[in-house]
Amino acid sequence: MRFFDKQIKAGDHLVTERLGYTHHGIYLGNNKVIHYSGLANGLRAGPVEITDLGTFSQGKRTYISHHSNRVFSHRQTVKRARSRLSEDKYNLLSNNCEHFVNWCIYDKARSPQVTKVAVGVASQVLLGNLSSGVVAFSIFNNIKNI
């Protein structure tokens, strides 16, 4: 595991790389992280759990995401995170590890990763439909002129 920040403190938002996405958790101190385990352990969605830092990062690059405009202090963030320990309501689109961390820090469950993917998919659908419409119009005009 590699860290690029000198000191991690309880309440810090940790981010670690995964294949195609990033995983998020809250550092509790004493080498422990609380996070929504989600699909980390296979196809079954897991609960909010406490794990050691090495297990959380799985040997991947891990860094602190700094929040200058956090609503809750580091101490309050830890308390909020612990209040959801064992919660088992993981949902990739509406209640994942990133939603969990942002709720702990801001009281707003949001996931910029999910938003980015949703916008990308919607754009592709719209562009695909637009392209299909142009092709259909072109074919219609060619048939009409025969």
Language-model features and meaning:
Residues 1-146:
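Cysteine-nucleophile amide-bond enzymes
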